[in-house]
């Protein structure tokens, strides 16, 4: 398996698996992955939170409105920062209740958000400090960047 090869060749490398399937998380952590990054924060697999707790690895919980198939179908928010904070209030509580001790939150730039939503969130990143956990902000190769600069993603 590629994960074992990477860990053998580069033992100090910290690997993350991007998945919303608990079985994938379990198998890849067993192979040497160090962290689970779930775009649904456990919403797409009822076993994810308990699995990550059992695995005892850091968990990146991302906010996404909708699913990967529907997230860009007219995303709507009344107050995006408040709604994402409210989501993480519930989600971090669920993670802690499941036994996850190392939580990282990701506001989910580009996942169920318009360019305007992304900029509103970016301007209010300090609101996430109330959780006292690391915040991951994935901005690379997002349409927010290339559309604002009037260039192509290439």
Say what each PLM segment does.
Residues 97-102:
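Flexible, glycine/charged-enriched surface loops at secondary-structure junctions
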Residues 108:
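Conserved Motif II region of HX4D acyltransferases
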């Amino acid at each position: 398996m590629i994960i074992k090869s990477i860990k053998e060749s580069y033992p100090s490398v910290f690997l993350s698996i991007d998945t919303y399937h608990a079985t994938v998380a379990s198998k890849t952590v067993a192979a040497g992955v160090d962290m689970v990054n779930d775009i649904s924060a456990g919403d797409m697999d009822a076993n994810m939170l308990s699995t990550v707790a059992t695995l005892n690895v850091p968990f990146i919980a991302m906010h996404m409105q909708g699913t990967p198939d529907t997230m860009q179908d007219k995303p709507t928010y009344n107050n995006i920062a408040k709604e994402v904070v409210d989501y993480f209030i519930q989600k971090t509580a669920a993670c802690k209740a499941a036994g996850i001790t190392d939580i990282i939150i990701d506001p989910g730039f580009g996942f169920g958000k318009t360019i305007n939503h992304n900029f509103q969130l970016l301007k209010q990143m300090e609101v996430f400090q109330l959780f006292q956990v690391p915040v991951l902000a994935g901005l690379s190769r997002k349409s927010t960047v290339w559309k604002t600069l009037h260039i192509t993603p290439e």
